[in-house]
Design a protein with these regions (language model features):
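Conserved hydrophobic/aromatic packing and binding residues within compact polymer-binding modules
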Residues: 11, 25-26, 36-39, 65
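Short amphipathic recognition helices of helix-turn-helix/homeodomain-type DNA-binding modules
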Residues: 64-71
């Protein structure tokens, strides 16, 4: 699993834990809902800047989005 897929899984998990929709996360982070969806599907790689904006919107550390978890 590459880092893009790890971020996709963590982003979806953290967003659901905060009970946020993709649209709400997009609004909070200044991104489009389409782009948030693409990140969650691992269709695109997020830049470090975008990673920081998403982490801020979710009130987590950027590393939380990149941390590999064991199944």
């Amino acid at each position: 699993m590459d880092l893009k897929e790890v971020m996709a899984i963590n982003l979806r998990r953290l967003r659901h834990a905060k009970q946020m929709t993709q649209e709400e996360l997009a609004d909070s982070s200044g991104l489009s809902a389409r782009y948030v969806g693409a990140i969650e599907r691992a269709d695109v790689s997020a830049s470090v800047t975008v990673l920081g904006r998403i982490a801020d919107a979710l009130h987590v550390e950027p590393a939380d989005l990149l941390r590999k978890t064991t199944p």
